[in-house]
From Swiss-Prot:
UniProt protein name: D-glycero-alpha-D-manno-heptose-1,7-bisphosphate 7-phosphatase
Residue sites binding Zn(2+) per the record: C98, H100, C106, C108
CDD domains: HAD_HisB-N
Pathway: Nucleotide-sugar biosynthesis; GDP-D-glycero-alpha-D-manno-heptose biosynthesis; GDP-D-glycero-alpha-D-manno-heptose from D-glycero-alpha-D-manno-heptose 7-phosphate: step 2/3
Keywords: Carbohydrate metabolism, Cytoplasm, Hydrolase, Magnesium, Metal-binding, Zinc
Protein source organism: Mycobacterium bovis (strain ATCC BAA-935 / AF2122/97)
Recorded name of the encoding gene: gmhB
Catalytic activity line of the entry: D-glycero-alpha-D-manno-heptose 1,7-bisphosphate + H2O = D-glycero-alpha-D-manno-heptose 1-phosphate + phosphate
Cofactor(s) essential for the protein: Mg(2+); Zn(2+)
Matching NCBIfam families: HAD-SF-IIIA, Histidinol-ppas
EC number: 3.1.3.83
Family: Belongs to the GmhB family.
Subunit structure, interactors included: Monomer.
Length: 190
């Protein structure tokens, strides 16, 4: 998964809640005060940035569609996230957000591939066959499968302890653990 991407343009698509930040059980991260980094996530993004030509956050935010928060609230959270990472030299190349409630039949809500395919269309230098989706839920892994069906290939990495039923190409306890494994495969020490 690591060596074959060296020297190529490709994208690492990351879920947000449950991968980068702590998920609010039974609710949504509605504002920056509720955003809580998962341990090691910011360091992991720095390490992954050295490997991945593009990093894009892909997230369902149905709290917008339910009227519990606005699209501006989500943008403010992402702006703060971006500013914190930028202070450490880390750039997120994009945030692809589905604001629709699950009852709506949009093409962008994960596991549908609309958000990823839209980003890939707008970035033709990125090789779709080398894309990787990283997430903590079955819908994230299904997203990778759906992107593969549309684009020809897409690897999946599961974060967290929930069983994927063997659907993921790789599984790690945290984004940090994934980043360390990538670093080791790239010959990094520490």
């Amino acid at each position: 998964m690591v060596a074959e991407r060296a020297g190529h343009q490709w994208c690492l698509f990351l879920d947000r809640d449950g991968v980068i930040n702590r998920q609010v059980v039974g609710d949504y991260v509605r504002n920056w005060r509720q955003f809580e980094w998962l341990p090691g996530a910011a360091r992991a993004l720095k390490k992954l940035r050295a490997w991945a030509p593009y990093i894009v956050v892909v997230t369902n935010q149905q709290g917008v569609g339910a009227g519990l928060m606005s699209a501006v609230d989500v943008m403010v959270i992402h702006r703060h996230l971006q500013m914190q990472l930028a202070s450490d030299g880390v750039l997120i190349d994009g945030f692809q957000v589905c604001p629709h409630h699950r009852s709506q039949r949009c093409g962008c809500r994960k596991p549908r591939p609309g958000l990823v395919l839209d980003w890939l269309r707008r970035h033709p230098d990125s090789e779709p066959l080398l894309s990787i989706v990283v997430g903590d839920s079955l819908s994230d892994l299904e997203l990778a499968h759906n992107v593969a069906a549309a684009a020809g290939a897409c690897a999946s990495v599961q974060i967290g302890g929930a069983s994927s039923g063997g659907v993921a190409d790789a599984s790690f306890d945290s984004l940090w653990e994934f980043a360390v494994a990538v670093g080791h495969a790239r010959g990094e020490r520490g």
